[in-house]
Amino acid sequence: MKSIAVTGYKNFELGIFKKDADEAVYIKETIKRHLLPLVEDGLEWVIISGQLGIELWAGDVVAELKADYPIKLAILEPFEKQSANWNEANQLWASEVLEKADYHAFITKRPYESPAQFAARDGFIIDNTDGALLVYDLEKEGSPKFFYDRATQAKEQSNYYIDCIDFYALQEVVEDMNQTF
């Protein structure tokens, strides 16, 4: 596998309102634990769309991994000015992750017009990656459902790789990290 998409809940869907909240430490560690074996097996690219929450935390994780591994980060935003209506702290977070990216592009080269741009993003990213790592629990629907459904279709048609991190997996990392301290 050469490329993987990472997506999941937006931070506010998880009740997290700061990028550096305590919960983010556990989420980032969980993402790292799932990415690291893939990176060690030759994963070259992690692709995110620059959404708040899981995707930007994944961008932070990839930036950390770059110190020791030849991994690259691509940010493929669904449209121009995605962060224009975000608060200042979230805009800063997005720009910090963007600075760490090895590649950046817009899937539709215009500002937001309709939800179809999100569907276009999902389709483009799935069509151009070998798999997806999702922080998504089937028991708690949210924004990742649309990507998950489309990725599941790709898996059925072309053996697309899906690694879904649910809340139980997150809880295991929390417990493991708390035992370590």
Swiss-Prot record:
Q: Which InterPro entries match?
A: YspA (IPR010697)
Name the PANTHER family for this protein.
Answer: UPF0398 PROTEIN SPR0331, UPF0398 PROTEIN YPSA
Family membership noted in the UniProt record: Belongs to the UPF0398 family.
Which NCBIfam families does the record associate with it? Answer: PRK13660.1
What is the name listed in the Swiss-Prot or TrEMBL entry for this protein?
Answer: UPF0398 protein lmo1889
Starting at the broadest rank, the lineage of the source organism is: Bacteria, Bacillati, Bacillota, Bacilli, Bacillales
